[in-house]
Amino acid sequence: MNPLTVAHALKKEEEDLLQQAGVPYHALSFTEIVPLTIDWPGGHFDYLVISSPQVVQCLLEEKPPYPHLLLVVVGEKSAARLKKAGYTVVHQAARGALLSDFFQRHCKECYLFIKGDRGGSDILTLWQHLKINYREVIAYRLLLTPYPLNVQPGALVFFSPAAIECFLQVQGIINVPVYCIGPTTAAALPQGILA
């Protein structure tokens, strides 16, 4: 049986689950996170929007200079970490596209979107459609770190569009079953490849 290749650095609990299930796997990280110094903009913001665990880490290391900031967060674990650190999370969803109802109800407010240099496009597209007032701040860069696989995978699991992009730079083609975590990742697959 060819191993499952996971294009993501696995957490301990994810590794444990695969081992308990008896699934042979390789975990590969095709990306590197490079934190940036955040240049906090002046002005008033009603909500701070957090869409990735990397931004959560940035906020835990560098507190924003805005008192009484209300957070809108993508991800249950991210919301829990921020609440534990003393932040006020007023709304949380599993992915950015699911925040649509909240943004429609609060379309007159001003938002600060802290994000990486990739991703977040579903939120930005919605805001532009709703004519929402926002500022965007880049907290980290996501570098692609392509390298060839030394083993023929039995299947691939992708956690991000960047991992798919990086994999294709080196491998050129995907000829095994593919599993994607989330619809945004699945949408990044080339035409003709089903997840």
Q: How would you describe each model-predicted region?
A:
Residues M1-A195:
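Signature of uroporphyrinogen-III synthase
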